[in-house]
Regions:
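Accessory carbohydrate-binding/adhesion or oligomerization-edge regions at the termini
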Residues: 108-165, 171, 185-191, 200, ...
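Generic structural motif
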Residues: 82, 178-180, 186-188
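Extracellular and analogous surface-interaction loops
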Residues: 168-181, 258-264
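Flexible, acidic glycine-rich loops studded with aromatic residues
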Residues: 1-132
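Extracellular structured ligand-interaction cores
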Residues: 53-55, 79, 167-169, 208, ...
Length: 291
């Protein structure tokens, strides 16, 4: 049998196959993973094939040492990952953003009813759209509460250096003056590799990230327990750094949400999202916490 990995051409050779390309919970930002899997073409087939397409493999290989095993599912978004993976591989084919928005209603129902006794670190985010400006390149467009800028560059055949400045822009419309809570992050380190920009300086975001709402700058709402720690600009497999467990504050979806003020009408959200070193998991997250 053939595993359908990054080379989708393998699935055209005949025989039975399993999609082993998109199932790494430990690798992706859990918010981004949920969106990416729903939009993924299961087994590289436009039309579901129940004869040869046997399904997919969902795995969680937390290679970095864990000191509190109760955090593994949370750090890797296991429950929301299982929900979307089951949806995509049960139905086959690939989904659209509009269909994802509808599916988020089902996920929200499951979160509040079926798995209500579990801490599920996920909120609906498919309707958020972004304009992303990377120095020296045309404006790019993305959707979702988490964006993998590396993936976005690959999709648009853009090559950048080891460091580059970039900005992301979106708008939130509010019916009245209000305050909302959001998750904000400028990195999503893989739980299988310690390469990372580490925790930001006290009072600042990681990876030199910055957040502006209607030109007002916002800073982390919590004090870091380990400011400027765990910056490893190299792959840590088979190295001592792999033995250092991640802490909650290194994952934006594990942090206390940030309160931001919105005025009635449109509100400009602007994030500074630089690439700061070679090999960086260049990504960002910004999504409303609905509960």
């Amino acid at each position: 049998n053939t595993a359908a990995g990054s080379n989708a051409a393998q699935t055209k050779k005949g025989g039975k196959y399993v999609d082993s390309f998109m199932g790494y919970l430990n690798y992706y930002d859990p918010i981004y993973f949920t969106n990416k899997v729903f939009l993924h073409k299961a087994c590289a087939q436009d039309v579901p094939d129940t004869t040869n397409a046997l399904g997919g493999i969902l795995c969680l290989w937390n290679d970095v040492r864990v000191d509190d095993k109760t955090r593994i599912a949370l750090h890797n978004g296991m429950i929301n990952g299982m929900m979307v993976y089951a949806e995509r591989f049960w139905n086959g084919g690939e989904g659209s953003w509009d269909e994802l928005s509808e599916f988020e209603d089902k996920m929200s129902y499951h979160k509040s009813h079926i798995v209500k006794n579990h801490d599920v670190r996920w909120h609906p985010n498919a309707m958020t759209s972004w304009k992303i400006k990377i120095d020296g390149n045309d404006t790019l467009y993305a959707r979702g509460g988490a964006v993998d800028v590396n993936d976005l560059c690959t999709e648009n055949s853009i090559t950048v250096g080891d460091t580059v400045s970039a900005w992301a822009f979106t708008n939130f419309n509010s019916e009245c003056d209000t305050t909302i809570k959001v998750w904000v992050g400028f990195e999503a380190a893989a739980r299988s590799n310690r390469i990372s920009g580490g925790i930001g300086p006290q009072g600042k975001w990681e990876n030199q990230g910055r957040l502006f709402v209607n030109d007002k700058e916002y800073f982390p709402s919590q004090e870091w327990n380990g400011p400027e720690k765990y910056a490893f600009h190299f792959n840590t497999w088979h190295k001592p750094e792999e033995e250092l467990p991640y802490t909650d504050e290194q994952f934006y979806w594990m942090r206390e949400p940030l309160s931001i003020d919105l005025k009635q009408g449109d509100n400009e959200i602007k994030l500074y999202i630089p690439k700061t070193f070679r090999g960086q998991r260049w990504s960002f997250g910004f999504l409303k916490v609905t509960e």
